[in-house]
Design a protein with these regions (language model features):
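Bacterial Sec-dependent N-terminal signal peptides
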Residues: 1-25, 208
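Exposed beta-strand and adjacent loop surfaces of beta-rich binding modules
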Residues: 16, 35, 58
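Short, aromatic- and cysteine-enriched interfacial helices/patches
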Residues: 17, 133-136, 179
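Short, solvent-exposed mixed-charge patches
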Residues: 20, 214-215
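Short N-terminal segments immediately surrounding and downstream of signal-peptide cleavage
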Residues: 21-39
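A short, solvent-exposed beta-edge/loop patch
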Residues: 145-200, 204-209, 214
Length: 215
């Protein structure tokens, strides 16, 4: 009986570990590709399923054949609208606009580590026109070797805010307090502790920012 329970415990542990690793191995910001309105700076608009690759650090879309492709000219894109959310093309980072003025953006990056060794596979990179999307073009993604080297274990959030005429960033309590003179840091440290602010929660941090700029 004890032996059976022992094997049962090992089996449950292995199943849980497999499920966890499967989830961790996703390299994308969203669990699934999202319907997106892609607005270019020259006024052109397209729709396509879009996601953000946290390892390769760029947005990807699916063409009509469900092939994942990178945007050919990402610098020409003004905004990506996913539902009621707006994203910008950052420098190797996904940037969500929560508020335009005063600025409050959330920057998403992947926390990665080396993947377990396994046989890599190859692929080719080529540029192709997506006719079904009325001119939306992309570059085919090379698969395998780069993806096999690292996996995403978590998603980091960095907050980019407008403070006066400057733009500053913070990601935890310590870096947030540095936005203020030392005399004010004690007060805001107490506020954070009393309200149990979780810097992983965009809603809580946004409310904290709004309170801080109103005083």
């Amino acid at each position: 009986m004890r032996l059976i329970l022992c094997w049962l415990g090992i089996w449950i542990f292995c199943v849980g570990l497999f499920a966890q690793n499967t989830k961790d191995n996703s390299s994308f910001l969203f669990d699934e590709f999202q319907d997106c309105l892609i607005v270019y700076k020259d006024g052109r608009q397209f729709t396509a399923p879009v996601n953000y690759d946290l390892i390769k650090k760029h947005y990807v879309f699916k063409d009509p054949e469900q092939q994942e492709k990178e945007f050919s000219d990402p610098e020409l894109i003004a905004v990506l609208r996913i539902g009621n959310r707006s994203f910008l093309i950052g420098k190797q980072e996904a940037v969500e606009v929560i508020q335009a003025q005063p600025k409050f953006n959330v920057i998403y990056t992947g926390d990665t580590r080396r993947a377990p060794k396994k046989i890599s596979y190859g692929g080719t990179t080529q540029t192709a026109s997506v006719d079904n999307y009325s001119g939306l073009t992309g570059t085919g993604l090379s698969g395998g070797i780069q993806d096999a080297q690292r996996i995403v274990t978590g998603i980091n959030k960095t907050y980019e805010v407008g403070v006066g005429k400057k733009t500053k960033r913070f990601y935890n309590k310590k870096s947030f307090l540095k936005l203020f003179p030392k005399k004010q840091q004690v007060r805001w440290n107490r506020y954070i502790e009393e309200n149990k602010i979780d810097f992983g929660s965009v809603d809580q941090v946004f409310k904290l920012f709004q309170v801080s700029i109103s005083h």
